[in-house]
Amino acid sequence: MSRGMSKCRITNTAPSARGWKATTFGDYAFSSRGSSEPNAMAPAIIEQIKDHPCFSREAHLYFARMHLAVASACNIQCNYCNRKYDCANESRPGVASHRLTPDQALRRAIAVANEVPQLSVVGIAGPGDACYDWRKTKATLIPIAREIPDVKLCISTNGLALPEHVDDLVDMNVGHVTITINMVDPRIGTKIYPWIFYDGRRYNGIDASRILHERQMLGLEMLTERGILAKVNSVMIPGVNDEHLIEVNKWVKDRGAFMHNVMPLISERSHGTFYGLNDQRCPATSELIALRDRLEGGTQVMRHCHQCRADAVGLLGDDRAREFTLGQFPADETYDSAKRNAYRQLIERERRGQTLEESDAATPVSAPSDELLLIAVTTKGGGRVNGHFGHAQEIQIFSVCQKGNGLIGHLKIDPYCLGGWGEEATLNTIIDALKGLDVLICSEIGKSPKNKLARRGVRATGAYDGSYIEQAIGALYRAVLHNEALATAI
């Protein structure tokens, strides 16, 4: 099955009199917010997140993660989950092509670490629950910490079995934990969780949701007390918990969560989930972005999540899991840190260069305070404009205004240009999804897609190829506001 476009609808907006649709995307009116990554942060926290792609928007441009699918057992049933479903092209949490033993996981981790110098994090995110299937989780992470000592370790959990393992996590030097928390009101929980398995018995209904809620809050508090960074994932389910997630954000902030990641429900009927089979709709992209903006000022909001598979490998948006199948793990391979050390030195230079260039580009702009552009960018990583439009598997969307710029989300797409030929239907789907944006910045784009985008009111440019993204969108913004001739830029 093809991954395809999301079911979430993105509608068009009318252009302003000046020809730049500067304030809306879909049904959503944008605020003038900048990046949600805090400017002032304790040095110890910066050190913890600087190379963790899931906890830092900047880090995800440079560093890769690896999920090891060893935890197959789970202790709750979610209405949005069916772990039995798998497709090589399907990208969503809980999906894995193969379950690994702890020994296979170690060999895969070493193979990936030797071939992917960007690797900085090894985690267990399913396909079941890392804390409930604790024996396998522990048997996997301990040897990895011994054999690959320069990677960070993390886990993802529903939180039900988390409290009894927090001290073990500290002893194993696991510094990052993600908890999926979809409610703090058990009445809402009954619409999401049919049952849980806790303390040797199965619970249903309000009792199940109450126990889960209490255990999640306890686990989060324990992580905070012990200095483990906690990220909270929440699935936005329209009509079920979408408004309630504002309350969830307040609760997790009070208990020390570092980051809150609100993800859209994925409810394709073919996945066989309760929600999918009952036609529960997923949120429109405009609804998701609007909710994330309403959460600003609470726990830091994550906007670069890719809803990764339980066996994901590589940079976010550039999965390489299929390069490392079971038969490709040499039994006697040992870890060699040379490539990774060289890469880290390169990235330090890149980051210093990016900081200097962005500082030079940050010239104050004289413009109306409500003037805002929506800019799409294709990138292969490194924080640069370096992605060919026809080969892109995702498009990042930025808002930019006089006060600054910020990543507001991304669109997952199928590349329309394969083997030198373009798939017309795929291209049309992508163009429909980009309606309402102002400019597309990419490294290259063909004449036909460029003209089609222009007819939809989206200008495309390859003039900033190789530039840092922040620098490129800032320069483009100034050119537009000053009514400069855009022939050289567009």
Swiss-Prot record:
<dbReference type="InterPro" id="IPR013785">
    <property type="entry name" value="Aldolase_TIM"/>
</dbReference>
<feature type="binding site">
    <location>
        <position position="80"/>
    </location>
    <ligand>
        <name>S-adenosyl-L-methionine</name>
    </ligand>
</feature>
<dbReference type="GO" id="GO:0051539">
    <property type="term" value="F:4 iron, 4 sulfur cluster binding"/>
</dbReference>
<dbReference type="Pfam" id="PF04055">
    <property type="entry name" value="Radical_SAM"/>
</dbReference>
<keyword id="KW-0004">4Fe-4S</keyword>
<dbReference type="GO" id="GO:0046872">
    <property type="term" value="F:metal ion binding"/>
</dbReference>
<keyword id="KW-0411">Iron-sulfur</keyword>
<dbReference type="InterPro" id="IPR003731">
    <property type="entry name" value="Di-Nase_FeMo-co_biosynth"/>
</dbReference>
<dbReference type="InterPro" id="IPR000385">
    <property type="entry name" value="MoaA_NifB_PqqE_Fe-S-bd_CS"/>
</dbReference>
<keyword id="KW-0535">Nitrogen fixation</keyword>
<dbReference type="GO" id="GO:0016829">
    <property type="term" value="F:lyase activity"/>
</dbReference>
<keyword id="KW-0949">S-adenosyl-L-methionine</keyword>
<feature type="binding site">
    <location>
        <position position="81"/>
    </location>
    <ligand>
        <name>[4Fe-4S] cluster 1</name>
    </ligand>
</feature>
<feature type="binding site">
    <location>
        <position position="74"/>
    </location>
    <ligand>
        <name>[4Fe-4S] cluster 1</name>
    </ligand>
</feature>
<comment type="function">
    <text>Involved in the biosynthesis of the iron-molybdenum cofactor (FeMo-co or M-cluster) found in the dinitrogenase enzyme of the nitrogenase complex in nitrogen-fixing microorganisms. NifB catalyzes the crucial step of radical SAM-dependent carbide insertion that occurs concomitant with the insertion of a 9th sulfur and the rearrangement/coupling of two [4Fe-4S] clusters into a [8Fe-9S-C] cluster, the precursor to the M-cluster.</text>
</comment>
<keyword id="KW-0408">Iron</keyword>
<feature type="binding site">
    <location>
        <position position="128"/>
    </location>
    <ligand>
        <name>S-adenosyl-L-methionine</name>
    </ligand>
</feature>
<feature type="binding site">
    <location>
        <position position="308"/>
    </location>
    <ligand>
        <name>[4Fe-4S] cluster 2</name>
    </ligand>
</feature>
<dbReference type="InterPro" id="IPR036105">
    <property type="entry name" value="DiNase_FeMo-co_biosyn_sf"/>
</dbReference>
<comment type="pathway">
    <text>Cofactor biosynthesis; Fe-Mo cofactor biosynthesis.</text>
</comment>
<feature type="binding site">
    <location>
        <position position="305"/>
    </location>
    <ligand>
        <name>[4Fe-4S] cluster 2</name>
    </ligand>
</feature>
<dbReference type="InterPro" id="IPR034165">
    <property type="entry name" value="NifB_C"/>
</dbReference>
<dbReference type="InterPro" id="IPR007197">
    <property type="entry name" value="rSAM"/>
</dbReference>
<keyword id="KW-0479">Metal-binding</keyword>
<dbReference type="Pfam" id="PF02579">
    <property type="entry name" value="Nitro_FeMo-Co"/>
</dbReference>
<keyword id="KW-0456">Lyase</keyword>
<comment type="similarity">
    <text>Belongs to the radical SAM superfamily. NifB family.</text>
</comment>
<dbReference type="GO" id="GO:0009399">
    <property type="term" value="P:nitrogen fixation"/>
</dbReference>
<feature type="binding site">
    <location>
        <position position="180"/>
    </location>
    <ligand>
        <name>S-adenosyl-L-methionine</name>
    </ligand>
</feature>
<protein>
    <recommendedName>
        <fullName>FeMo cofactor biosynthesis protein NifB</fullName>
        <ecNumber>4.-.-.-</ecNumber>
    </recommendedName>
</protein>
<feature type="binding site">
    <location>
        <position position="78"/>
    </location>
    <ligand>
        <name>[4Fe-4S] cluster 1</name>
    </ligand>
</feature>
<dbReference type="InterPro" id="IPR005980">
    <property type="entry name" value="Nase_CF_NifB"/>
</dbReference>
<keyword id="KW-0614">Plasmid</keyword>
<feature type="domain" description="Radical SAM core">
    <location>
        <begin position="60"/>
        <end position="309"/>
    </location>
</feature>
